[in-house]
Amino acid sequence: MLLPDLHPYTILLSIFLVLVVKQLVATIGKSTIQEFVWLVYLKVSSNQSIKTYNSKQHELHETNRQKRAISAQDEYAKWTKLNRQADKLSAELQKLNQEIQQQKSSIDKASNALILVLTTLPIWIARVFYRKTHLFYIRQGIFPKYVEWVLALPFLPNGAVGLTIWMFAVNSVVSNFSFLVSFPFAKRVSKPVRDTKVE
C-alpha cells in the first residue's frame, strides 16, 4: 500500500476536519478568501511595483488637490503644468496597475490551488486508499438488517460503518449547521406584493 495504515479514528477525525474546512470555504467563498490572501500579500510583500504604485497614487492625489486649489484662469501656466503632471502620473499608474493585476492573477491561482489541495485532494486520497477500512462498528440489533446493510456500503460487512457513509453523514451535519449559523446573517428577502389587476 502506498499510504500508511492509519487507525480508523485517525481517518475519521481527519476526514471530519477536511469536510469542516471545505464547508467553511464554501460558506465564506473562494473569492473572499482570495481577496484576503491578496491583501495579506500586499501587506507583507516587498514588491517594488506595489510600493511605486502606492507612492505614485499618493503623488497623483496631491497633484489633483493642488490643481483644484488654484484657478485655471488666474494661474494658467501653473495649472497646465500640474495637469500635465497628473496625466503623466495617470499613465504610469495605469501601466503599474496592469503589472499588479498580473501578480494578483498569479496569487489568485496559487490560493485556488492551495484551497483545492486542502479540501479536495485529501478526500479523494481517502476514498481511493481507505474505502475498505472499518471506521467503527454498530452493535447488532440496534438497526434492522437492511439499515445495517446500507451503512456498510459499498465494501464492508454488515455492522461496520465505512468512509462513504461517514462522509455523507458528516457533510449533512456540517452543511445543516453551517446553514443554521449563516441564516440569521443572510440578506433579508422582502415580502412579496400581490399584483393588482387594472381593469
UniProtKB/Swiss-Prot annotation:
Topological region Cytoplasmic: 32-115, 178-199
Classification via Pfam families: CHD5 (PF04420)
Spans through the membrane: 12-31, 116-136, 161-177
Chain ranges on the Lumenal side, renumbered to this chain: 1-11, 137-160
Record keywords: Coiled coil, Endoplasmic reticulum, ER-Golgi transport, Golgi apparatus, Membrane, Transmembrane, Transmembrane helix, Transport
InterPro entries linked to this entry: Get1, Get1_fungi, Helix_hairpin_bin_sf
Coiled coil start-end: 76-116
GO biological process terms, semicolon-separated: tail-anchored membrane protein insertion into ER membrane; vesicle-mediated transport
Localization annotation: Endoplasmic reticulum membrane; Golgi apparatus membrane
Membrane topology type: Multi-pass membrane protein
GO molecular function, one term: protein-membrane adaptor activity
GO-annotated cellular components: endoplasmic reticulum membrane; GET complex; Golgi membrane
Family the UniProt entry places it in: Belongs to the WRB/GET1 family.
Quaternary structure and partners: Component of the Golgi to ER traffic (GET) complex, which is composed of GET1, GET2 and GET3. Within the complex, GET1 and GET2 form a heterotetramer which is stabilized by phosphatidylinositol binding and which binds to the GET3 homodimer.
Protein task: Required for the post-translational delivery of tail-anchored (TA) proteins to the endoplasmic reticulum. Together with GET2, acts as a membrane receptor for soluble GET3, which recognizes and selectively binds the transmembrane domain of TA proteins in the cytosol. The GET complex cooperates with the HDEL receptor ERD2 to mediate the ATP-dependent retrieval of resident ER proteins that contain a C-terminal H-D-E-L retention signal from the Golgi to the ER.
Protein name per the record: Golgi to ER traffic protein 1
Native organism: Candida albicans (strain WO-1) (Yeast)
